[in-house]
Regions:
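Surface-exposed amphipathic alpha-helical segments
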Residues: 38, 151-179
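Sec-dependent N-terminal signal peptides
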Residues: 4-14
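N-terminal "mature-domain start" segment
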Residues: 21-51
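Conserved polar/disulfide-associated segments of primarily extracytoplasmic proteins
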Residues: 46-143, 147-149
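Sec/Tat signal peptide C-region and signal peptidase I cleavage site
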Residues: 16-20
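A mature extracytoplasmic/lumenal domain signature
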Residues: 36-38, 44-45, 70, 125-128, ...
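Soluble non-cytosolic domains of exported or imported proteins
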Residues: 29, 82-89, 166-170
Length: 179
């Protein structure tokens, strides 16, 4: 039985199993992919954004570390694609350090897992206060983000914290249909 089919069957069982399966995939692959970054706050699509995902949980539960480079250009994109794993660790340690300095409450966890059509969406919460984000637009996190797993590729959606979950899902559904 194909490996991908087995993974999808596991994801269908429960939210907890879904979270665990996605986490295991991230942990094993370390770097899944570099995907496009959609900024939904101004309803525009920005191509060339980078999304890299890797683990950072001390308790080995469903906690992940997420880095989104504020610098979007082809040179850095190519650099990250070819960067050795050890240097990539250092890159994101430094990058995420900026967020830790801004907020001691820094944490990202899987909040929910939803099935929209054939694709899976992970809704995650970032605890960085919105007032800090408003002061410095270069900070990598807003208060509510979502990931979609599409053909083994991770997409990050940055959303306004004042939007409702229903609005988020509507936005995601629209984008998913365009993939």
């Amino acid at each position: 039985m194909p490996k991908m089919f087995l993974v999808l069957m596991i994801l269908l069982l429960t939210n907890n199993i879904c979270n665990a399966a996605i986490y295991k995939n991230i942990e094993n692959d370390f770097l899944i992919d570099i995907g496009d970054n959609w900024n939904l706050s101004d309803k525009s699509t920005q191509e060339g954004g980078m999304v890299l995902i890797f683990t950072a949980s001390d308790d080995k539960k469903s906690t992940v570390r997420v880095g989104v480079s504020p610098v979007i250009d082809e040179k850095e994109n190519a650099t990250l694609r070819n960067m050795p794993k050890e240097l990539l660790n250092e890159y994101f340690d430094a990058f995420i350090g900026m967020t830790k300095q801004a907020s001691s409450k820094y944490n990202i966890t899987f909040a929910d897992c939803k099935n929209i059509g054939p694709h899976y969406v992970l809704l995650v919460n970032a605890s960085l206060p919105m007032e800090i984000y408003k002061k410095d637009k270069q900070l990598p996190f807003v208060k509510s983000n979502a990931f979609i797993v599409f053909k083994k590729k991770i997409y990050l959606f940055m959303m306004d914290s004042w939007d409702t979950e229903e609005t988020h899902l509507q936005q995601l559904t629209t984008i998913i249909k365009s993939l």
